[in-house]
Amino acid sequence: MSSVFSYFNESWMLLLATVFGLAFFLGIFLGRPVISWLKKQNHYDQVHKEHCEKLEALHQDKKNTPTAGGILFCIVLLTTVFLWLPLGKLSTWLFVFLIISWGTLGWYDDIIKKERKKGHGITAKQKFVIQLIISAITIVTIFSIYKGSALFCTLQVPFFGTVSVGHSILGKFFYFVLAMLTIVGTSNAVNLTDGLDGLAAGTTCMSALGLLVVALSNPTMPLAQDVSIVLSALIGISFAFLKYNRAPAQVFMGDTGSLLIGGVLGSCAVMLRAELLLILLGGVFVAEAGSVILQVGSCRLRKKRIFLCSPLHHHYEYKGISETKVVARFYIAGLLCMILGIIAALWR
């Protein structure tokens, strides 16, 4: 194990701890001012759930809770990038682009939801097109950073190590599609997970920590150092956000936070060629998104529901399990997924 992390010496680990600490304390310090500002702007959660009267009734106590708290993630992550990453590197500005683009998309969606008063943001098609554009720009930029490196056409397969996907046009096309699915899919999956107090922030800590281990165990990746710094900050701000987002939540991250987190996590996985590992590390996100896909597919094809309600966490709410118990059980599942993902990544 020590040889795996030999490239990252004690001073580097100290730097990552510093990044984590700064992100954590900055999030704690800015939390209350941001919440107060959101309240003044009337950024309150819209509890209206069309065709989901029971869910609306279950969440009535959340109607006076401000949302769009994900702006904290934007502030802290941008601060981290400008403090710790060299401004002369293309990768630095790629992270700036990721944070601003995903954060802006989420913020705009939250604004539209607020104005329409019905809990509906921009249409699914509009959001999907914007996500594809952001992801395509990200992938092309990553390709230019790798500059034709052999590592660009590799893939970390769980329990099998790094394998080549080929340098042919077909291989590169496969890479592009997989990368696109990873970024867009993770962004939407985290967005779907953000439905209970503390659920998305807590599971983000685990997935990001697992991905950080992947970065530290693959020092030859061109972006491993930059990714490890950003992930350390993401873990720090996620922990800090839990102070205000755990039950009973004082603020919700909204799409501003969930789309940003998913976009950054997915992009970091692509930078590390760890798209398949993220399926394990973010197992909770996969289950949440999968439950929605299965539910929609079953309703359209069979005219029957598989779950009482989707995403998955609402299914358990419908069964009468308290919100805090559902979150606790999903935390346990997230921890197990993280451990399994780390083992799969380090298995040589």
Curated annotation (Swiss-Prot):
Cytoplasm keyword on record: no
GO terms (BP aspect): cell division; cell wall organization; peptidoglycan biosynthetic process; regulation of cell shape
Pathway participation: Cell wall biogenesis; peptidoglycan biosynthesis
Molecular-function GO terms, alphabetical: metal ion binding; phospho-N-acetylmuramoyl-pentapeptide-transferase activity; UDP-N-acetylmuramoyl-L-alanyl-D-glutamyl-meso-2,6-diaminopimelyl-D-alanyl-D-alanine:undecaprenyl-phosphate transferase activity
Gene Ontology CC, one term: plasma membrane
Catalytic activity of the protein: UDP-N-acetyl-alpha-D-muramoyl-L-alanyl-gamma-D-glutamyl-meso-2,6-diaminopimeloyl-D-alanyl-D-alanine + di-trans,octa-cis-undecaprenyl phosphate = di-trans,octa-cis-undecaprenyl diphospho-N-acetyl-alpha-D-muramoyl-L-alanyl-D-glutamyl-meso-2,6-diaminopimeloyl-D-alanyl-D-alanine + UMP
Keyword tags: Cell cycle, Cell division, Cell inner membrane, Cell membrane, Cell shape, Cell wall biogenesis/degradation, Magnesium, Membrane, Metal-binding, Peptidoglycan synthesis, Transferase, Transmembrane, Transmembrane helix
Bilayer disposition of the protein: Multi-pass membrane protein
Enzyme Commission identifier(s): 2.7.8.13
Predominant location: membrane
Cofactor: Mg(2+)
UniProt subcellular location: Cell inner membrane
Transmembrane portions of the chain: 11-31, 68-88, 92-112, 128-148, 165-185, 196-216, 222-242, 251-271, 276-296, 326-346
A matching Pfam family: Glycos_transf_4
Function: Catalyzes the initial step of the lipid cycle reactions in the biosynthesis of the cell wall peptidoglycan: transfers peptidoglycan precursor phospho-MurNAc-pentapeptide from UDP-MurNAc-pentapeptide onto the lipid carrier undecaprenyl phosphate, yielding undecaprenyl-pyrophosphoryl-MurNAc-pentapeptide, known as lipid I.
HAMAP family listed in its UniProt record: MraY
Record-stated family: Belongs to the glycosyltransferase 4 family. MraY subfamily.
Name of the protein described by the UniProt record: Phospho-N-acetylmuramoyl-pentapeptide-transferase
Source organism: Chlamydia caviae (strain ATCC VR-813 / DSM 19441 / 03DC25 / GPIC) (Chlamydophila caviae)
